[in-house]
Swiss-Prot record:
Organism domain of life: Eukaryota
Biased composition (Basic and acidic residues): 24-54, 326-336, 629-668, 679-689
Lineage: Eukaryota, Fungi, Dikarya, Ascomycota, Saccharomycotina
UniProt keyword annotations, A-Z: Coiled coil
Annotated Low complexity bias: 82-118
Region of interest called Disordered, as start-end residue ranges on this chain: 1-127, 205-234, 308-355, 629-689
Biased composition (Polar residues): 312-324, 337-346
Biased composition (Basic residues): 669-678
Keyword Nucleotide-binding recorded: no
Stated name of the protein: Uncharacterized protein YALI0A18139g
Coiled coil region boundaries: 361-628
């Protein structure tokens, strides 16, 4: 159980080898590995000794080994993880020896080469002390019999771990496979009183799955969290609860039993909400405790005693609208509080097949990021360490505080020292070779530099030549510019002199012209002054003559205006007379029409009365006859005849009554319908034949006026209906159908027509006239 804690190169190397075991090619077991294995065997002997002691006292063994395995495993795993990689060849040898010892006669003959024969479980495994010891020993790859048992039993665990191999890995020296085999296979425990191999396999599976839990959690959703043995992981296919494992299991009490039971399958359950609130998957506690599981509806409250809404209770006033607002606010607040409390109480499961809550996802993401950054940091440190190790130099002074100062442990063997020295020399050779390479590189670089410097010198000389040429050119250009500027100045001077001469000439000529013009103006003014005096005299005489003529014209105009006024007044009086005549004719016609209507109605009423009177008399007579008949024959008749007669009596009476009702209905209907049609019908009653030709104009006028009146009545009724029921929109109203413009237009049309035209119009019972009137009427705005 002793560990060498002194810092050494070997321990770090071994850690790195374990980490990179998958990547490295297969190695042969070295001298160092053999030396380490020798130490292992020494430790195994010690363990055997303690085991023998424990077997003698079975009572204490159960108690002590309850705690022992965890301590032993924690103590020894440090060594095992460092040194298991090297424990291949001799372990293999010891296991084969032990197999030969422990194998009884009934071993199967046909065993494949790569596998070892399965021995039956030794008697020591039946005792309660052994499983614990085996577990403790196997974690650190301890005692030979235990090792063989563990390896042989771990063969069925190949189904679980993808990298686990059989004993062939030990033979071939595949170190990574051997480590996998030891890690996955040996952390088993044989239960008490297990005679057959089946039960051991079962527990091996359970333990192997637990180990896989710890190592291979890359598939599970929360791979950043460490999975403890027995913790809930839905990716494990066969889940064994703690109650199924035996009480002698070495891991029985290492995990607390206080965790609640978690189901293997989370079924999706519906939570009724409105669409705005997210739905979370139910918590695992939902299955065990139904009291807390509530659905979060819009109005639902977690307060069981619900108070009825009180209008007096609101603070914002007693009117209904504010009360409604208050109620709405309350509902939304309760919904919010319900949701928050529900989320607090039922936090979603870590892996749910349903939607995970966004805040939970954020937590998970942050944890994952932390884990990744930590891993990156570790990897970086490891790489830095490796680089330092590569640079390791023998000539380092011991004063420098370097990790790799050779503090050799006392128990290091010669082989190990020899190997270390070999390695260091190879490293030195490599570094010298590298130095040589670097020197060659430096030489090459210096040659290139020399070449480049030569090129630069040549370029510089070229550049200087170019600069000289440029200066020459610039000088020439400056001289040219000077020459050109002088020439331009001379030209300008000449031009200005020329212009000045021309200006002087022009000004002299202009002055002469101005003097001449002034002289002319003076002459003209003298002439004008003499002429105006004579002109004024003539103008005055003309003006007086004109004035007298104008006065005469004014007198004439006033006379003409008076005459025009008289004529206009006469025309006005004539038009007024015509209008009055028209109105008289209209009123006479209207009165005649009304008289006609009244006569018509009176006649109808009389006829109706007569008809009704006759019918009533008939009815009365029939009733009387019936009564008399029924009195006479009531005693002589049978019931059948009576009923027959009754039917006979009923039918004509009912027929009569129905016909009477129908006639009444018809009359009333026709009356109501003809109320608005009568005038237009009466227009068509006129016939042209018997009248005189001189009477045609008056007949046409009568017909026209009738038409217009009918139109007016229809229009008025329509306007009335419109006002009552607002049939058309509010802006559109029917006029009463008879505006002054319409009447005037129609009458003018007809007063101007000749008789032949009127005859044509009135032919065919006045149909042409109706059509004509329709066209006129539609043309005029009502």
């Amino acid at each position: 159980m002793t560990t060498t804690d002194s810092p050494s190169v070997l321990q770090d190397k071994d850690i790195d080898r374990l980490v990179n075991a998958q990547k490295k090619p297969q190695e042969e077991p070295t001298m160092k590995d053999k030396a380490l294995l020798f130490e292992k065997q020494r430790q195994e002997k010690k363990m055997k000794h303690t085991e023998a002691k424990m077997e003698t006292n079975p009572l204490t063994s159960a108690k002590t080994f309850r705690k022992a395995p965890t301590e032993a495993s924690t103590a020894t795993t440090k060594d095992s993880t460092k040194n298991v990689n090297n424990a291949t060849s001799t372990n293999n040898a010891t296991s084969t020896k032990n197999n030969t010892k422990n194998t009884p006669k009934n071993t199967p003959k046909n065993i494949p080469k790569n596998t070892t024969a399965k021995p039956p479980i030794p008697k020591s495994a039946m005792k309660p002390s052994v499983p614990a010891a085996a577990a403790a020993v196997s974690t650190s790859a301890a005692t030979a019999p235990a090792a063989t048992a563990s390896v042989s039993v771990s063969e069925p665990a190949a189904a679980f771990s993808p990298a686990s191999h059989d004993m062939a890995s030990f033979m071939t020296g595949d170190t990574s496979a051997a480590i996998e085999c030891l890690m996955n296979g040996t952390s088993t425990s044989t239960p008490q009183k297990s005679a057959s191999g089946i039960s051991t396999n079962k527990h091996v599976n359970a333990a192997a799955s637990q180990v896989n839990n710890r190592s291979n959690t890359s598939n599970s959703f929360d791979s950043h969290t460490t999975q403890k043995a027995g913790s809930y992981n839905p990716n494990i296919t066969n889940i064994l609860s703690e109650r199924e494992l035996d009480s002698t299991d070495c891991y029985a009490d290492s995990e607390s039993r206080s965790q609640p039971h978690k189901p293997s399958v989370l079924l999706p359950t519906t939570v009724l909400t409105d669409n705005k609130t997210p739905t979370y998957p139910p918590s695992p506690e939902f299955f065990s405790d139904h009291t807390d599981a509530r659905d979060v509806r819009v109005g639902a409250s977690f307060v069981n005693h619900k108070q009825p809404y009180n209008f007096a209770r609101n603070n914002h006033g007693s009117d209904v609208s504010s009360a409604m607002d208050n109620a709405r606010r309350q509902a939304s607040e309760t919904r919010r509080s319900n949701l928050s409390s529900y989320n607090d109480r039922n936090q979603p499961a870590a892996h749910s097949y349903l939607r995970t809550a966004p805040n939970h996802m954020e937590k998970i993401r942050t944890e994952v990021d932390k884990e990744q950054t930590r891993e990156k940091k570790l990897a970086r440190e490891r790489l830095a360490r490796k680089q330092q190790r590569d640079k390791f130099d023998l000539l380092q002074t011991p004063q420098t505080k370097n990790k790799f100062n050779m503090q050799v442990p006392l128990d290091m063997s010669e082989e190990q020292l020899f190997e270390v020295i070999c390695k260091l020399t190879t490293q030195l050779d490599q570094s010298q070779a590298r130095v040589r390479e670097v020197e060659e590189l430096v030489q090459q670089c210096s040659e290139q530099l020399n070449e480049r410097s030569v090129e630069i010198d040549s370029l510089k000389s070229q550049y200087e030549e170019g600069q000289g040429e440029k200066e020459m050119l610039v000088g020439q250009l400056e001289e040219q510019l000077k020459r050109v500027s002088e020439e331009k100045d001379v030209e300008l001077r000449q031009a200005t002199e020329r212009m000045e001469k021309e200006l002087n000439d022009v000004t002299a000529t202009k002055d002469h012209e101005i003097q001449q013009l002034k002289q002319q103006v003076q002459d003209l003014t003298i002439q004008l002054s003499s002429a105006t005096v004579s002109d004024v005299k003539t103008l005055r005489t003309d003006y007086e003559h004109y004035k007298s003529q104008c006065y005469r014209k004014d007198v004439m105009i006033s006379e003409l205006e008076a005459r025009l006024q008289r004529e206009e007044n006469l025309e006005k009086f004539e038009t007024e007379l015509k209008d009055k005549e028209k109105r008289l004719i209209k009123t006479e016609l209207r009165l005649g029409q009304q008289a006609l209507e009244q006569d018509h109605e009176r006649q109808k009423l009389e006829v109706e009365k007569k008809v009704l009177g006759e019918k009533d008399e008939e009815e009365r007579l029939r009733e009387r006859l019936r009564e008399l008949g029924s009195r006479d024959r009531s005693y002589n008749r049978s019931s059948r005849d009576r009923s027959h007669d009754r039917l006979y009596e009923r039918s004509p009476r009912s027929r009569d009554r129905s016909s009477r009702d129908r006639s009444r209905d018809r009359y009333s209907r026709s009356r109501s319908r003809s109320r608005y049609r009568r005038r237009s019908d009466s227009v068509k009653d006129y016939s042209v034949g018997p009248r005189d030709k001189g009477d045609l104009r008056s007949l046409a006028l009568e017909k026209i006026i009738d038409f217009l009146l009918a139109r007016q009545k229809a229009g008025a009724q329509r306007a009335h209906m419109d006002a009552c029921y607002n049939v058309s929109g509010p802006g559109v109203r029917y006029g009463d159908g008879l505006s002054d413009a319409t009447v005037e237009k129609v009458l003018k049309e007809f007063l101007n027509k000749d008789e032949g035209y009127l005859m044509d119009l009135l032919e065919g019972d006045g149909k042409r006239l109706d059509e004509y009137l329709g066209t006129i009427y539609s043309g005029v705005g009502v």
